[in-house]
């Protein structure tokens, strides 16, 4: 009874303390000596009836309840392993050694599986916790408020300065009119002395040109005459009288006038073309006289001066 009590007390000590290194070596030596036992399907039993694997990331959210069963697994392994603290391996009988060896062989791989699963689960939980802490520690910096961005954009690109620059360039363009006539006091640059034409616009989805010239041509059927002359003319000769059929300077003047006279019998509106053309020239002259800001003098001297200094002198003289 005494050795059994000692053995029982020794096994109870194993639950609290892990075995020493020399005891493990002796156990490995005994396992190597004993023949490997073949187990039947009835003797093989599962440790747990259900696994703890989940498909979702809920495992990381529950680290606290998992620590308790892992400690119980390690304690079970320490309880099952039979270790003699008194080191009395030589006094054991052969039958007892065989029984213990068989039990060790039967439970050895199961214990190794349980310890491996426990270590894998613990390492997985530790790695997940460490990765989560690393991600939390390396979180990106907070984004600035959109209001601050707009203030920065306004500081770097002020719109007021750009508008001032544009106004300054426009003022410089207005002060470029420096060639003033001595008689009328008006500018003599090419832009100011260019003749002004009557206004025109595009109609019918920008396909038809609405102008005074086109109204005269379509109203007097001159467009039909131009089309006939265009198809009858020879382009190799270079005589484009189809654009101006009433001109006297181009070739075949008599034949053109005879053809237009014959067409006027069927199209009497062609007779209205000469007076309509005269009225158009008169309207152009009046419009140009009113809207042209430059000088109209034929023979006059040009004075180079600034517009601001010569404006007062120009206003005093008659135009």
UniProtKB/Swiss-Prot annotation:
Alphabetic keyword roster: Acetylation, Cytoplasm, Developmental protein, Membrane
Membrane topology: Peripheral membrane protein
Domain SPR: residue ranges: 183-295
Stretches that traverse the bilayer: none
Protein origin, superkingdom: Eukaryota
Chain positions with N-acetylmethionine modification: 1
One Pfam match: Sprouty
Subcellular location: Cytoplasm; Membrane
Keyword Disulfide bond: no
Residue ranges with Low complexity bias: 112-131
Basic and acidic residues bias spans: 69-79
Region annotation (Disordered) ranges: 54-160
Annotated GO CC locations: cytosol; membrane
Primary site of residence: cytoplasm
UniProt GO BP: animal organ development; negative regulation of epithelial to mesenchymal transition; negative regulation of ERK1 and ERK2 cascade; negative regulation of fibroblast growth factor receptor signaling pathway; negative regulation of lens fiber cell differentiation; negative regulation of Ras protein signal transduction; negative regulation of transforming growth factor beta receptor signaling pathway
InterPro entries listed in its UniProt record: Sprouty, Sprouty_domain
Assigned protein family: Belongs to the sprouty family.
Function: Inhibits fibroblast growth factor (FGF)-induced retinal lens fiber differentiation, probably by inhibiting FGF-mediated phosphorylation of ERK1/2. Inhibits TGFB-induced epithelial-to-mesenchymal transition in lens epithelial cells.
Domain notes: The Cys-rich domain is responsible for the localization of the protein to the membrane ruffles.
Subunit structure: Forms heterodimers with SPRY2. Interacts with TESK1. Interacts with CAV1 (via C-terminus).
PANTHER family in the record: PROTEIN SPROUTY HOMOLOG 1 (PTHR12365:SF10), SPROUTY (PTHR12365)
Name the UniProt record assigns to this protein: Protein sprouty homolog 1
Organism: Cervus elaphus
């Amino acid at each position: 009874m005494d050795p059994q009590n000692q053995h029982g007390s020794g096994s109870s000590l194993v639950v609290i303390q892990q075995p020493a290194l020399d005891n493990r070596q002796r156990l490995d030596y005994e396992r190597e000596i004993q023949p490997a036992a073949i187990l039947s399907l009835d003797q093989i039993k599962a440790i747990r009836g259900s696994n703890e694997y989940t498909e979702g990331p809920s495992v990381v959210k529950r680290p606290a309840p998992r620590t308790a069963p892992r400690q119980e697994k390690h304690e079970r392994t320490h309880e099952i392993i039979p270790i003699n603290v008194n080191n009395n391996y030589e006094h054991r009988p052969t039958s007892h050694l065989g029984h213990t060896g068989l039990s060790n062989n039967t439970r050895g791989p199961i214990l190794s599986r349980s310890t491996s699963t426990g270590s894998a689960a613990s390492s997985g939980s530790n790695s997940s916790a460490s990765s989560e802490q690393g991600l939390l520690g390396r979180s990106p910096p907070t984004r600035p408020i959109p209001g601050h961005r707009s203030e920065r954009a306004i500081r770097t690109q002020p719109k007021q300065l750009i508008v001032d620059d544009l106004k300054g360039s426009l003022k410089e363009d207005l002060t470029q009119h420096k060639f003033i006539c001595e008689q009328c006091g008006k500018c003599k640059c090419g832009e100011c002395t260019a003749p002004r034409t009557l206004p025109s616009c595009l109609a019918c989805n920008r396909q038809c040109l609405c102008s005074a010239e086109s109204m005269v041509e379509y109203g007097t059927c001159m467009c039909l005459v131009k089309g006939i002359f265009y198809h009858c003319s020879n382009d190799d000769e270079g005589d484009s009288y189809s654009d101006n059929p009433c001109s006297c300077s181009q070739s075949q003047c008599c034949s053109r006038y005879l053809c237009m006279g014959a067409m006027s019998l069927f199209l009497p509106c062609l007779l209205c073309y000469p007076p309509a053309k005269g009225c158009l020239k008169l309207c152009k002259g009046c419009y140009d006289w009113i809207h042209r800001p430059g000088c109209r003098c034929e023979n006059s001297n040009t004075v180079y001066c600034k517009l601001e200094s010569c404006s007062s002198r120009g206003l005093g003289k008659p135009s």
